[in-house]
Each structure stands twice: as C-alpha cells, then as structure tokens.
Amino acid sequence: MKKIFFYALGLMCALSAQAAVIQVTSDKSGTELQEAINGAKSGDSVLVQAGTYYGNFTMKEGVNVSGGWNEDFTAQTDYETILDANADGRVLEQPSNFTTLTVWSNFTIQNGNLKAIRSVPASGLSSGVALGKKGQVKHCLIQNNTFSYNGNCMGGGVGNDSIDAATDVCAEDCIIRNNCGTHGGGARVRGTLLNCVIENNNTNNSVKKGPAGGVHLQGGRMVNCIVRGNLSGGDTGGVRCWGKSQIINSLIAGNTATGKVGGVGIENANSDIIGCTIVNNDQLVNDASHNSKCGISCGATSDNGTKLANNVVWGNKHKGVVQEAQVYYISHYAAANRIYNAITHQNTTNGIKLSMNNDENDTYTDNDSNEQTGRAPHFADPANGDYRLTWQSPMLGRADSSIAVVTKDLDGNNRNIEGVDLGAYELPYYTLTIAAFDHATLTIGEDAYTAGEYSVPMPKGYTATATIAPAEGYSIKSVKIDEDELEAVAGVYTLPAVSANVTLTIEIQQDKGTAIDNTKANTKAAKQIRNGQLLILRDGKEFNVLGSQL
C-alpha cells in the first residue's frame, strides 16, 4: 500500500519506459522515502519536500534524489530537507561502485554515529556520507556526524573511495562542518572535493584520535575549497596528502594540530599545491625541531616530484608564535622538486626563509625575492579571516600563469586580469571610463590622458587621485563620478575607492574675455564688430579675435 501511495503522489510520467519524477511529501517517514527510492528505476528522479526524515539511507544507481522542494514542488531551497540518522549508524551510503553518475543534492545530512565497522562501499568510511565511484553529493550541508567505537571512521562528514580523482567529483558546493572522524574530521577522499567549505571538524575523539582535522586526501584532489578552523588529534590540522594528491586554488586557514604540521602535510608520495593561501595555522607539538612544519611539511619520497607553486604561506605558528620558517621540505629525489613563485612569512631582514634539507641539488627559486623582502601580503582583514588581497599587495600579478590551472579564483573572479595573483584570491579589477573631453590634460597617478575617451582598469579598493590641467583659455566647469560631483582640494581630485565600474566626466569651458591666439597674425588692422554685424572667416585666413570684442 505504501508504494501505491507514493506513486499516486508522485508519478509525473506515464508508466512506461520513460523516466519518472517521483515526489515525496513531508508527511512521509524516512522509511517511506527509502521505499520510493528502491521502487525507482535508473533515470528516474526523486523530489523530496522540505522536512525531516529519520533513518539510514541508501543510494540507488542512476536515481538522482534532490531535497528542499516547496509544497507544490515548484521551487527549491538548499538544506531545508533534513536526513537525520538520530545518532544511530551512517546517514547515507552508496552500496557499491556505480557506472552511472548518481547525485543526491540540496539536503542537510546530519547526526550519523558509526558504532561498528562497515565495509560498504569500503571499510571504515564516514558516519555521514560514504561514497564510491560515480556517487556524488551536491549543495548539501553535512554536519554533526561522529563515531563511538574504537575503529576507523575515515572522513567524519564525507568518506569517498572513488577510483579516478581527476574525473570523480564526490562532493560539490557542500558545507562540511562539525564532524568527527579518524582520518579527516571533515572528509577523506580519493576523488575530488570541488567548491566546498570544510570547517570546525576534528579528529580528536576521546575514543580514537587521528590525523587531518580537516581533509585527508588519499590520492585525491581538492579544488576551490576553504578548509578552516579544524582540529587534529594528531598531526596535520588542515589537509593531509597521502598518495599523489593535489590541492588547487584553496584557502587553508586557522587550523590546529595537537601534533606537528598546522596547515598541510605531504606524506608517503609527492603532491602538488598550486595557487593556495595557507595562513594562520598552528601546531602544538612540544618538540621545537618541528617548528618549521607549521605551514607546509613536505616529506615526499617519490621521484615524481612535489610542486609548490603560486602560493602564499604566511603567519603560521608553533604554539601561537609565528615562525620564521614556514615550509619544511625534504626529499630523497631533490632534483625533481620545486618551490617557486611563493611568498612566505619572514621575521628577519634575511628575506624569505625556508627550512630545507642540506642538499645542493635542491632547487628553490623565488621571483623578485629581494623586492618582496620584508613586505607583508596586505590581506583585506586577516584578523577576521578575510585573506582577500588589497591593491597594495606585492602578490598581485606575481604568479606563473602557465601553472594557474583554474580560470576562476575562490570568489569566482576571473584569473589573469592584470597577471595572475599569488594565492587563492584574485584582486578584482573594474573599469574607469573617462568620458570624452577636450582642451585639458588629465593625470591619474603617473598616467596622463589628453583629449579623448578612455577605459582604464582599476583594482578594487584603489583610491586614485587626479589633477586636471586645462589648456590656455579654458577652465574646469565640473568633474563627476557617475552623477556625483567631485571637489578639488588644493587642485587635487580624490576619486572614491573602486568597487564597481564607474564613469568620470570632465566638463571644460572656455573662459570669457580670454584671447585665443593663432599661429599666424592678421596683417590687417583690427576691426570692431558692431551689434548686428556678421563676421565671415574665409579659408586660408587667420585672425586674432579678442574676447572683449565679441
């Protein structure tokens, strides 16, 4: 009877080989939701109304399930449909690897509690969401999942045992927070995390502690993600790379390890960290010999080479004290390793300082290191966690564009506007349109503009000053930014801080009573033009006309 009821509610297409859309209303139980999924076939979609559904849920291959639907299934809101395990077992799992991409989206997935080992789809995965190949969660809030047995719970929020990290996105546009696991408090993945926020997770369970408070990459990828405020019960507060992994265009900030490595730990095999901002992480290990491992620790031992490029590593700490050296780098295959196009924290006048093993074959190059010596990154508001760039930053345009593997930054701004910036954020540029003007020279900063119309790229937040020098016989009538008139102070106009595309309009007027001299003098005597008379100027003749005679 339940199945008949569900299909009566939700079958939007004729009972045929065509895909069906099945609607589940909020008065139904978690058991009935699972029955609707079990009764669907590959290609069908299940739409779930906003509400709370208790239980343990299993994906079915080829059946996409989405939550957040309103009363008449015409609009959708993220996180309004809640899947709650009520602290008893895993919330959502994929029973085996799929060959058809299967997506669950727009859910809150919460209150899982793994109490014993589960081998589905792989042994010891998450209490929140456990995924294999071709399984994906999207636009989901995954929170408050934990474990209560002395065994593995790899990835408290999301555990993934995908095969191909390059093509398998296991979680996209998700918030993964307040979860507890053993290898990655937030997530443990072999696939790809894309556009996710992983925050306030831990591997500090009293039952069993583990490494990687935020993310454990088991040969996986993390692209355009934020990893912040996580706590490790062992080593690596932010992200641990085990196996050949990649961290691309991501922010790793404010994480803490009770052991060593506050930010990123690369172990077991070489990995790539490209275009990332790794800041303000802390390690609490007692052994001072690990001080330099506060930002990035590279213990790579493979001849594939670890690549650290286009990053900013700044302000990472040991027991709350910012360390002079921010990156620890050791390799048995030194010639294959590179650290370049990076700015790291320095407390001395010796420039950028790295802790490296004493091997003359190691290669470290830093573009313009002398110019960068002693210069801070100029973040927007680091005290409040805003590590976006300001226009004063020495990181602007310093990255190697050939290594910039994404076209958008962490905010979705285009990369490579005026060169690629170091770190995860690109400073936006706006257009200052200078409306057509004549009879004056405009100077903005060190750039001069004569008569004409111009489009000038301006960095966000930049406050430009301008001077205007009218030609002889002319003066400034008005200066406006869009519709707002500007007033000069001691001859200098201050343009408002750039936050949008704007138009600068300069109106120049001819002075009354001012002579306009031409290059050739008229040999004829000056004539007085009386009221009512017409003066005709013919080709080939030039005159000196005094304004007082007009």
Which residues make up each language-model segment?
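C-terminal outer-membrane/trafficking sorting elements
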Residues: 511-550
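Conserved "repeat-terminator" motif of extracellular CCP/Sushi domains
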Residues: 426-436, 490-511
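Surface-exposed interfaces of beta-sheet-rich extracellular modules
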Residues: 405, 462-491
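Right-handed parallel beta-helix/beta-spiral solenoid domain characteristic of secreted/periplasmic
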Residues: 63-118, 374-377
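Surface beta-loop-beta hairpin patches that serve as ligand-binding interfaces in beta-rich domains
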Residues: 393-430
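N-terminal extracellular ligand-recognition/capping segment immediately after the signal peptide
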Residues: 27-34, 44-73
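Right-handed parallel beta-helix/beta-solenoid
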Residues: 16-35, 42, 52, 377-385
